Amino acid sequence: MLKAKLATFLLTVSYVAIPFSVSAQSWGPRTLPQLKAEAQRRADGALPPVDHVKPADMREALAQINSLEPDEWAKAFIMIGDRYMIQAEQALKTNSDQAALSFKHAWEVYNAARWPTENSPQKKLAYEKALAAFAQYGKLISPPVEVVRFPFEGKQAVAYLRLPKDVRPAPLIFAISGLDTRKEDMVVTNDLFLKNGIGIFAIDQPGTGQSPLKIDVGSERVFSAALDYLQTRNDVDAKRIVVRGQSWAGYWAAIMGYTEKDRIRGTVVHG
């Protein structure tokens, strides 16, 4: 018994005395210097959630932040996003490729401003600006991003659709965004599917982005309404749809695996 207690004591001491790494999710609140260092490290290494933010833009934004207030964080990035929007509007007159790139950078910086969720006035503003920048970017890429709206319980739900150039009707990946990602991320980061003749339908999970529902039991019904809509389109092969749920959206993908088993080919729980 004494040996067992001693072993337990030594094991406990070893964990306390020896430094070890933990995931960001299990770490406590960061100080401002810690937050800045981690944000810059992720930008430098192209790591999520700021993997598309230029390191120089991150340094510029962080230099303007002097507190942990969400609005101060958002304002610093909004300023940079606004600059990219001006560049994009100017480039539209002569160089659509450059305009697309500037709209993309604007969206990515605004997206960093609103991350992880739109819970303050400036973060809400950043999200509105991100949607506007993305809409312009989506028009200029190939294949373009189509904004689709479908009826849902007296309202309109919003999603995105991209179809491969030469396949009609096209099979689809039905992509649901995670807790801190948005449908914009889903629809422009899956080009490999498009190159292989598979379209992308992207939608926000309940409680995030432009979803008309909060997270609750039964909120998957918005996805059923989306399937209803997709069945009305002649350019979509509604008999060949696979649902992909990223991160927390894997929960919704799993649910759709049995609630919509007769209308989908399968689900991928990715997260």
What are these regions (language model features)?
Residues Y229-G271:
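Primarily recognizes the serine-hydrolase "nucleophile elbow" in alpha/beta-hydrolase
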Residues L179-D191:
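The serine-hydrolase catalytic nucleophile loop
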Residues F77, E118-V167:
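N-terminal cap/lid segment of alpha/beta-hydrolase-fold proteins
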